[in-house]
Amino acid sequence: MKALSKLKAEEGIWMTDVPQPELGHNDIMIKIRKTAICGTDVHIYNWDEWSQKTIPVPMVVGHEYVGEVVAIGQEVKGFNIGDRVSGEGHITCGHCRNCRGGRTHLCRNTVGVGVNRPGSFAEYLVIPAFNAFKIPDNISDELAAIFDPFGNAVHTALSFDLVGEDVLVSGAGPIGIMAAAVCKHVGARHVVITDVNEYRLDLARKMGVTRAVNVSKENLNDVMTELGMTEGFDVGLEMSGAPPAFRSLLNSMNHGGRIAMLGIPPSDMSIDWNQVIFKGLFIKGIYGREMFETWYKMAALIQSGLDLTPIITHRFPIDEFQQGFDAMRSGKSGKVVLSWD
């Protein structure tokens, strides 16, 4: 079958032929319709330090997808041939304390689809049936293909009560923009997003944020004054991994504020801990999606009117995958979807 693989320990990704994956007793096989390019896939393409430590070569990559069930393992119940599915990309062990306690997103033995085992940039993907999620009929293939990153946004945004709250989102990448849209949809008062990438900030404006602030040109304190805010933000979502953005977020939080962190800062990042301690801030780390509460919320949010379509900015047939990666690497894109149909 055709697949996009990391074939060499250098920059790039290559189309190749690989054997079709084998089906286990508890697995389903999915014929891929559409895939989306994740920031992780760009790291793998660039062959950065994290990729060099993590990714075995050769390896089929990709973990954002939608497809159709074409084969079912003999022990599988609840799925039928022809079901349209996406899937949770974190495969968990089922026997550690967190798995047995129902907190599977915190499994210490997590294996990543397209990171530690063959991924979805292929004609066929095999995953445990436990990880598959049926897509409702009124959700398009394109939106279903971005459920994985949308889930990161939903998990982060819904970490805290948002109704009537003022929210600051640092980092206007696709996940940050989707998180901001979720906050607005569920009843936050002001949702402000910051970045230095004007293309992405324009995208955030299309998604309905209160203010999209280019911090290289505009002062966040002035924006808060303009919005009539006198005490700082109630909720902060750190989506950038950039130390200056996180420090600015800490400075802008109200006392007792709550922060969810999805962005991954450098391990040696320094901050003013007085901002955390004397403000009584609560900081929560976010990894992946809650299984499967986040997935049900994703579907419900779209079905209740949340419009994510502006975040998908580029579409290519799979044979033009290089253009898709070029768009993602340029910084002038939202989500990029590749069609395998």
Swiss-Prot record:
Gene3D superfamilies associated with the record: Medium-chain alcohol dehydrogenases, catalytic domain, NAD(P)-binding Rossmann-like Domain
Cellular component annotations (GO), alphabetically ordered: cytoplasm
Quaternary structure, per UniProt, is: Homotetramer.
Protein name as it appears in the record: L-threonine 3-dehydrogenase
Q: Which domain of life is it from?
A: Bacteria
Reply yes or no: does the keyword Oxidoreductase apply: yes
Q: Sorted alphabetically, which InterPro entries does this protein's record hold?
A: ADH-like_C, ADH-like_N, ADH_Zn_CS, GroES-like_sf, L-Threonine_3-DHase, NAD(P)-bd_dom_sf, PKS_ER, Zn_alcohol_dh
> Can you name the source organism?
Yersinia pseudotuberculosis serotype O:1b (strain IP 31758)
Q: What class of enzyme is it?
A: oxidoreductase
* Cofactor binding: number and manner: Binds 2 Zn(2+) ions per subunit.
What's the catalysed reaction? Answer: L-threonine + NAD(+) = (2S)-2-amino-3-oxobutanoate + NADH + H(+)
Q: Which cofactors are required for activity?
A: Zn(2+)
Where do the annotations place Zn(2+) 1 binding?
A: C38, H63, E64
The alphabetical list of record keywords is:
Cytoplasm, Metal-binding, NAD, Oxidoreductase, Zinc
* Annotated SMART domains: PKS_ER
Determine if Signal is one of this entry's keywords: no
SUPFAM superfamilies hit by this protein = GroES-like, NAD(P)-binding Rossmann-fold domains
